[in-house]
Amino acid sequence: MAIANKNIIFVAGLGGIGFDTSREIVKSGPKNLVILDRIENPAAIAELKALNPKVTVTFYPYDVTVPVAETTKLLKTIFDKLKTVDLLINGAGILDDYQIERTIAVNFTGTVNTTTAIMAFWDKRKGGPGGVIANICSVTGFNAIYQVPVYSASKAAALSFTNSLAKLAPITGVTAYSINPGITKTTLVHKFNSWLDVEPRVAELLLEHPTQTTLQCAQNFVKAIEANQNGAIWKLDLGRLEAIEWTKHWDSGI
């Protein structure tokens, strides 16, 4: 998918990886970039607007833990204004295994609910035009950081959901792929809580190993958007972009 002249909604587009990705997207010249985030950041929005004045950048406050009906109402406002949306990026995430319910609500349920809400506008069975979803998951969805099992499980769930969305594309007209960053230098990983304090130094230990910058991750994210491969499981690690081949151990047969 060429980003130029497209309409894009980016949930959590002002976070660490999110904001650098928003910058890279704006440089690529979409028609509209709509950022949905929990906390407004006027300076960040102003920076994005200045980066490419030809791109219309707008912001709406959004908490992914709200009911689907509220999300649908917000999306209707956006669709009424833009008429069409080409790409939805689901990027909300927290890393704090003290907050079990919230971790699941933000990292998994929020992705499911936002996706469910946009189907009302995209699903070809309802006369919709289809669309593309990019879900930010994590390499911990492949193999857990076992000291943060709640976070890792929430990302594995989001990855599984995304893989299913891709297989449903012939029915819905909506394609999907996952973006799975490795350890990236963001505020998310500088300090966080392990489950039941099983490893108080988990963040410190992770950062002793090679990482990548948010800019490296963002640049590869844009490459994945441009590749636009339904069902792709993209690993963005150590500054590299790699498509992962998922090993099938069981098949429902339906």
Swiss-Prot record:
Substrate binds at S138. Pfam families: adh_short (PF00106). GO terms for cellular component: cytoplasm. Coiled coil: none annotated. Its EC number is 1.1.1.1. GO terms for biological process: alcohol metabolic process. Disulfide bonds: none annotated. NAD(+) binds at residues 10-33. Keywords: NAD, Oxidoreductase. One of its GO terms (molecular function) is alcohol dehydrogenase (NAD+) activity. This is Alcohol dehydrogenase 2. The gene is Adh2.
